[in-house]
A protein has these predicted regions:
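Short, positively charged and aromatic/hydrophobic N-terminal segments
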Residues: 5, 17-23
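Membrane-interface loops
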Residues: 60-73, 102-186, 238-247
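C-terminal membrane module of polytopic membrane proteins
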Residues: 213, 219-247
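Interfacial helix-loop-helix junctions of multi-pass membrane proteins
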Residues: 140-141, 159-164, 201-227
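Membrane-embedded alpha-helical segments of multi-pass membrane proteins
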Residues: 86-93, 167-171, 218-222
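N-terminal transmembrane-helix/juxtamembrane module of multi-pass inner/ER membrane proteins
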Residues: 22-94, 142
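Aromatic-anchored segments of alpha-helical transmembrane domains
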Residues: 53-55, 120-128, 197-207
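Hydrophobic, membrane-inserted alpha-helices
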Residues: 93-97, 173-178, 198-205
Length: 247
């Protein structure tokens, strides 16, 4: 029996194979994308930035009378430009802490986000109702060096308004609290201790750079103490009670 070669049939088979191959790749890509969306579905929390940033920018630009925040203790705190290092590390501290929990533990990420977003929202409301600022920044620096240059840069970018309570202080406390309650990080005491030291230095930096009054720091500490039980203590009591019931 003689078989006839049909070039059109061969071409059709090849096209079917190519189509099946491409379809398989597309299906795998879609499946992987769905898996990533499901895995990182808590990314919706980041949409809070669309609320916070426009509101904060409005507060920074609006023309109004600001109540000056000042404490007698501020006059005894010297200007120390070297604290610009921990002050700037705040941005790294928050970013790394947030990213760590985002990619490793959804529950801890939600608690960190709840703590930060609650305090930042209260901050926005306070500054909207009670416009505030300070007049603590030095007119001239006692020394000229790379650190004072960095401070000068921060002064030019950040207005001395909307300072009560201090978000630098509050968010540092939030990051430290999240790290302290992390089960995985409890195995790495060096990381925890290092974060506590950095957090404390960041808090100190706000007053030594004259970016905040001691009043702003106290207000941030008070706000953290009020929100902490709702985010951490209450939740952990519920979890402990549930585990006891299961036993």
């Amino acid at each position: 029996m003689i078989s006839c070669y049909n070039p059109f049939e061969t071409k059709e088979r090849n096209l079917i194979k190519i189509y099946s191959f491409e379809k398989g790749i597309h299906m795998k890509a879609i499946s992987k994308m769905k898996s990533l969306i499901l895995k990182y579905r808590h990314a919706w929390v980041l949409l809070y930035g669309l609320i916070y940033m426009p509101w904060f920018c409005y507060l920074e630009k609006r023309q109004t009378i600001h109540y000056l925040i000042h404490s007698p203790l501020d006059d005894y705190i010297p200007f120390v430009e070297y604290f610009i290092i921990p002050y700037l590390l705040w941005f790294v501290f928050l970013a790394v802490t947030g990213a760590y929990f985002f990619f490793t533990n959804r529950r801890d990420f939600y608690r960190l986000a709840a703590f930060l977003c609650s305090g930042m929202t209260i901050f926005l409301i306070v500054c909207t109702i009670f416009p505030n600022g300070l007049n603590l920044r030095p007119v001239t620096f006692p020394r000229e060096n790379i650190f004072t240059d960095l401070v000068r840069m921060i002064y030019s970018m950040d207005t001395p308004t909307n300072v009560l309570p201090s978000i630098h202080v509050y968010n540092s406390i939030g990051a430290m609290a999240a790290i302290a309650h992390s089960t995985s990080l409890k195995k790495h005491r060096g990381v925890q201790i290092g974060s506590y030291v950095l957090g404390i230095l960041i808090i100190f930096s706000t007053v030594f750079l004259k970016q905040h009054s001691i009043t702003d720091v106290i207000a941030a500490l008070a706000m953290a103490c009020m929100i902490y039980p709702f985010v951490y203590a209450t939740q952990e009591k519920k979890e402990t009670k549930l585990s006891q019931q299961l036993i």
